[in-house]
Amino acid sequence: MLTKEDFRNKYQYHQATPMLQQYLDIKFTHQCCILLFRVGDFYELFFDDAIVVSKLLGLILAKKGKHAGQDLPMCGIPYHALESYLPRLVEQEHKVALCEQLESPEEAKKRNGYKAVVKREVVRIITSGTITEESLIKANVPNYLAAIVIHKDIASIGYCDVSTAEFIVIDVAIHNLTSELSRINPKEIILSESLQHNSGLLALFDNYKQKIVYQVESYFSFNKAQRVIQNYYEIITIDSIGSLNSTQVSAVGAILEYLSIMQKHSKSKLPFPQIVSYENFMLIDASARKNLELTSTLSGNFKGSLLSIIDATVTNQGGRLLHKFLSTPLAEVNLINSRLQITDFFYQNLQLVENLRQLVKLVPDIERALSRILIAKALPKDLESIKISLKIALSIKKELNKVLEEGNTPKYLEEIYNPLFGDNELYELLDSALLDDLSNSANDCGFIKSSYSTKLEELRNLIHNSSNFIEQLKLQYRQETCIETLKICHNNVWGMFIEVSSKNAHKITDSKFVHKQTTTTAVRFTTTELQTLEAKMLNAKTMAAALEQEILAELCKAISLKSEKLSHLAKSISLIDVFCNFAYISHEYNYCRPEITSDLAFNIVDGRHAVIEKLITKKHESFISNDCNLQNDQRIWLITGPNMAGKSTFLRQNAIIVILAQIGCYVPAQSAQIGVVDKLFSRIGAADDLASGQSTFMVEMVETSVILAQSTFMSLVILDEIGRGTSTYDGISIAWSCLEYIHSNIRCRCLFATHYHELVDLASKLLSLKNFTVKIHDSNDKLSFLYKIIEGAANKSYGIHVAELAGLPRIVLNRAKEILLELEHNKVNINQSNNNITKSIDIAVPPYPVKTIEIIKQLNPDQLTPKEALSIIYKIKNTILLEEDEKMI
């Protein structure tokens, strides 16, 4: 941020025109924003903003005269096209300051002469975390703004969705912060600028660097936060909003302060923050959330994610609630079973589900409509959404009432049913005021029925029937003056006037006729009536539009008085949509109801992968189901087998089954008994973290470290190929010791896939570990994958067979087989090792080329620069050529 003096010097402020000086004054206070500066019917951008935005939006970069002897860069956006351009700016994480004209040029001239500059002011700052417009925001995804305050080893997170008036505060341990951030996925994060000097804490936000908004330390002070909260909610003491600790108060205050600055005159009215306990929810670490592709694929797409498969919701608010369910599975048995009871109730009443879905899909996005109404940013269609929702709510209630009267319904269903209300008074008010069809009406006028307001009806009559009014007045004056040729005329100089011929002018005797002009052939007059009619005609459209906006504000106020009930109604409709969705997909996909217990049970019969099953079904193929029984004597499954045989799919499908069960949905299996999982961890796949300079192996070890440190006996841990990112020596040692630690220290349920066949002998030492492998058919060196998990251990990796399927050259494959035979002469013997930890492992290494291997063994890949790596490659090449020459000699 530049100082005022530096800013003015940079832009040569004192050489600017008065309007450009006004622009620079406003830009100085909004240096972090792209400034859209309203000039007539356009938003204009200058200097660097013009250059950036013209490239981003494909606009013509023009010039607006000269400034300080140089062309002034400028581009513009038509004001009526703003909403079509804004999304592209917001998607690129730009803040946009909207500067509007507060008066017309005519008003400015009256105020301060012809040189006056029109008053302008930033009325709103649009950011990715504070938007509410439909055109700027994804319909089925929450849009969170977060503020985080860290004290010692606890992070207090306040986060809100302005578009739905949701506000939550939660405390998490620092080591769980990245997992929590991946769950919330905030669009903006407000942090203290002091964190910029703490590299350790700042590393926790590596994936969110573009979303961080730094504020000065005082922004988060407890005393300031108290004042902000008291002013925002108009309360005497912050005790009124709940028992918040000091860091939670600071986080809540930071959010409210940020909103007040960004939204200027249109301030959100968030409810009191809901204090959430972490204990009731399953923790899914960031790696697991990513690798399981819960809400988006690894490439960032919705299609192909788990959510894309299970989302058949019919409303936007239902889609958002399902997104929250999937992001935040429950970890409390009674809460999970309450949800499952509702899902089961609807599953047993599929005709009811069909009837409800037909009704619910007619409900607009009442949640976001209500939020826009509360912040005075409502459009007519938002009020229409409330009206439609009130009407349909009665039909939904009537449909549910039929089954409730029969009894034997889940208690939780009554909690969903009770908020369904059809407020006749509010509905009739909206119905009497709003046009029945708003699809063809503009947002600023033409949406209120004429019959609702006598004054509006008069104005519209004037607009549509002005010629009739003029004709009636002309006939009246002819009768009063006895001049049959009297006319009412109009020109640009005099406006409307009464005209009679010179010879008839003497007949005008009434004083109400005021002389305006005499010409060679006629005399012109005016009257108060005519002037009033002319003024009304000129102002009728403006007055009608203003009156409609007044009526809109009155209707919004009436809705605001019922906002709490309407919010509960929206939640009920969302819940009905989600649970009907669960019943619908469970029936369509042949899912079963899981049994959730408080012990460590885990018995899946004929489990399937929800996503892959749907993808291959489209190809008319069948998914091979598999059992998984992680019970007492086999809490750990050590799974060996070749690549492409289905190990990773099996690992993922069991994690997905757990998640689906704990959100209250049926699962893809014949049966499922699951002891509630408190934390879900996975280490699947290999990827360098180039941004932070971490190699594949370092990423793998960091994630494994987190798993070993945070897992409990109630957790589910999924590990795939631990140790493969380093040498075979180290890899086996690490995988071995991790297995021992999970078995003897954590004692949790675990699926562990590996290519280190030497580990299978651990089954004779670790009593709760069982070996499983993937069934294959190997005939005459022709390999067929059967995708069935069976008890036992793979006797070889079949890696060369897979390489053959991939199309490696025959000469390479033959050489690989030769090397494999040499390696298999000397295997790791686990039974002869120390019981507690691997001391040493003896693996034969081909004797050729010895010098090359020695060079590689001395390398530390994590510390190499690209230039050093290239140099070493040349060195290895030369060494190999030299050794080949020596061999030939």
Swiss-Prot record:
It holds the Pfam family MutS_IV. ATP binds at residues 641-648. The keyword ATP-binding applies. Keywords: ATP-binding, DNA damage, DNA repair, DNA-binding, Nucleotide-binding. GO terms for biological process: mismatch repair. GO terms for molecular function: ATP binding; ATP-dependent DNA damage sensor activity; damaged DNA binding; mismatched DNA binding. This protein is involved in the repair of mismatches in DNA. It is possible that it carries out the mismatch recognition step. This protein has a weak ATPase activity. Belongs to the DNA mismatch repair MutS family. This is DNA mismatch repair protein MutS. It comes from Orientia tsutsugamushi (strain Boryong) (Rickettsia tsutsugamushi). The gene is mutS.
